[in-house]
Amino acid sequence: MSYAYDTIADIIRLAEENNISFGDVVLRYELENYDRNEEAVIREIEHRLDIFEMSIQDGIAYTDKTASGMSGGQAAQLDCQSPRFMSEIAYKAMTYAIAVNEANAKMFRIVACPTAGSCGVMPGAVKAVADYYQLDRATVVKGFLAASGIGNVVANRACVAGAVGGCQAEIGTAACMAAGAIVEMMGGTPRQVGHAIALCMKNLLGLACDPVAGLVEVPCVKRNGFYAVHAITASEMALMNIESQIPPDEVIEAMNNIGRAMPAALRETSDGGLAVTPTGTAIAERVQSL
């Protein structure tokens, strides 16, 4: 049989019909459509997981400021302290996500998942959960497979670029991927993965992409920390059988429609939002003079 899918509903249906997980459907689709065996697919995913680890380490270890002076050292500042209010998982997810985006801002190697501007959410949330529960590599690989299926659906049916759909498309997709990965890793059902996606995306619709000075630093770096925790919140709800009234595919469609209705000033042009505040404008002028 074919494991082709166009929607989240397709993946859920295929998983339930074959009594397999959400991530297993994505794996079988890969094997069915590309000239690779399972070992090769897993090896490629493990390579990306290794880069997750390296980018977290780089972001924490290298504390110098970026050329713009807007970021650098914040992940290390969090890493050397203990949380006052947050759980250990949430605090680590926030720290790791910021670390990866600081690494990105300094041109270290990262995995764009789905974009460079949102590259911290998946590594941050997934590593925090995997470390806390001491999950093995095979389990994390399954989570990565689920996340890749989610990203494929959003990219093909909507958009993942801030220039097209605002930051809701970038950080929103990243958070959905992370939430789905966590549910998969924790043994959740395909339907719970779907609800995690819907709950996650619903609660960031309309988010603008307004980078100061056109750089992927403000508000991007700290925003990754916030939305790594958001992904964990969505996965927690879904695993507790809290359901979204709006199905995931309809939420994705709504995101796409909202994004395309946004003015260009709020879609990565730096012509609106935080980028044109007095402070944002002054930073842009200073950066341009460097």
Question: How would you describe each model-predicted region?
Answer:
Residues 1-108, 132, 241, 248-290:
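Generic N-terminal targeting/processing segments that precede catalytic cores or assembly contacts
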Residues 184-290:
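Functionally critical mobile loop/hinge segments
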